[in-house]
A protein has these predicted regions:
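Short, conserved micro-motifs composed of acidic
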Residues: 1-153, 157, 179, 192-194, ...
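Short, histidine-centered active-site or binding-site loop motifs used for metal coordination
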Residues: 15, 68, 250-251, 256, ...
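Residue-level detection of beta-strand scaffold positions
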Residues: 38, 120-122, 187-189, 207, ...
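Extracytoplasmic/secreted envelope proteins and their assembly/folding machinery
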Residues: 40, 256, 264, 268-271, ...
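Conserved beta-strand positions that form and line the central face of beta-propeller blades
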Residues: 42-45, 98, 251, 258, ...
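Periplasmic OmpA-like peptidoglycan-binding domain that tethers envelope proteins to the cell wall
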Residues: 76, 277, 285-355
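Periplasmic peptidoglycan-binding/tethering modules of Gram-negative envelope proteins
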Residues: 141-281, 354-355
């Protein structure tokens, strides 16, 4: 019997149960880097000599719920019981743990399903003689890692859905990165974002021959709700020599060229873009609003552009691929007639100087 589980795709995306002379076993199939599936093999972390079935991998991609027959090898309340395991940081799995009474009974339980927020679970039980569906509030210890659904629609400059594109999700203070494909028919995408550690998240568009563009989502924006990225928040623009593109969310302290931690987080994504596109040469441009002395603004913009260049070099981008220049207040994107517009003019751009 096949049990499809597609949530993340990095760890486990398909589990099956098969019946042989001895009972049921759970099998695992891992997704290869090219998107194809590996051969299903027994998932011996959970399999016993008895019946093991009904696997459910939560959207956190780390917590697996399943059912096992209670035996001396795997004691429980009775009959078929619900268990769970978690994947550890080193890739190993914890020891199976019984979800406990009164969820498990002396009869059989099957098919546990946990809501995306990890708070409510549903399952079938034959307690009392007939199969019925029950729900309960999942206790803290058995809950998966907190996650949220990040979704949006990606369209090009003409308003048409984008095909052959990928959304990259990165976490501040972590090397963990996930990728989801954009639906080429309608431009929609959806990604599971882990929110347990309360980290800011950077969402980046990746499409061959197109510019780097990202959106920073503050950890406070998640909470218990899903997050929708509006179409205008992410641009999909072709790389053109001489064209300028803004790197969003590059922030500095007032009158300072010192990069903030959030700015460094964004620039790590930009560095990945440059390393992946090793033939591109870019010029880093610093811009200010019109508040303050002209010469001081020019010097500040030069220092900020240089600090961006130096940080990119520290991340492994070759220095001979980068130049930096400041323009002060001389090249506003919009009129400096409101605080909102002045904020738009305090920006860092990159210009394609060669490909």
């Amino acid at each position: 019997k096949s049990v499809p589980l597609y949530y993340d795709g990095r760890i486990i995306t398909g589990l099956t149960t098969t019946t042989d002379f001895f009972g049921n076993d759970i099998y695992i199939s891992k997704r290869r880097e090219d998107g194809t599936w590996g051969t299903a093999v027994p998932f011996d972390v959970v399999n016993t000599a008895g019946k093991d079935k009904s696997p459910f991998l939560h959207q956190d991609s780390e917590t697996l719920y399943f059912v096992s027959q209670c035996t001396k090898e795997r004691p429980g309340v009775g009959g078929l019981d619900i268990f769970y395991i978690r994947q550890q940081k080193d890739g190993s799995w914890s020891e199976p743990k019984n979800i406990g009474y009164p969820i498990n009974s002396e009869s059989d339980e099957l098919g546990l399903f946990v809501s995306i927020d990890g708070e409510v679970a549903y399952f079938s039980s034959r307690v009392g003689g007939d199969w019925n569906i029950f729900s309960f509030e999942l206790y803290e210890e058995a809950r998966p890692q907190s996650v949220a659904l990040l979704k949006g629609v990606l369209k090009d400059e003409n308003g048409s859905p984008v095909s052959n594109a990928t959304i990259e999700v990165a976490y501040e203070g972590s090397d963990e990165i996930t990728h989801v494909k954009v639906n080429g028919d309608d431009g929609k995408y959806a990604a599971i974002v882990k929110t347990e550690k309360k980290q800011d998240v950077m969402v980046t568009v990746k499409k061959e021959g197109h510019a780097f563009d990202s959106k920073l989502i503050a950890k406070e924006d998640f909470g218990k709700k899903d997050v929708t990225i509006r179409g205008k928040d992410l641009d999909v623009k072709k790389l053109v020599v001489g064209e300028a593109y803004t790197i969003n969310d590059i922030l500095y302290a007032t009158s300072s060229a010192v990069l903030s931690d959030k700015s460094k987080f964004i620039l790590k994504g930009f560095a990945r873009f440059l390393i992946e596109n090793e033939t591109i040469k870019v010029g880093i441009q610093g811009h200010t609003d019109d508040v303050g002395d002209d010469n001081r603004n020019l010097k500040l913009s030069e220092d900020r552009a240089l600090s961006v260049k130096q940080y990119l070099v520290s991340l492994g981008v070759e220095a001979n691929r980068l130049t930096s220049k400041g323009f002060g207040e001389t090249m506003p994107n919009v009129p400096n007639d409101s605080e909102q517009n002045r904020a738009k003019n305090r920006r860092t751009d990159f210009v394609i100087e060669g490909m």
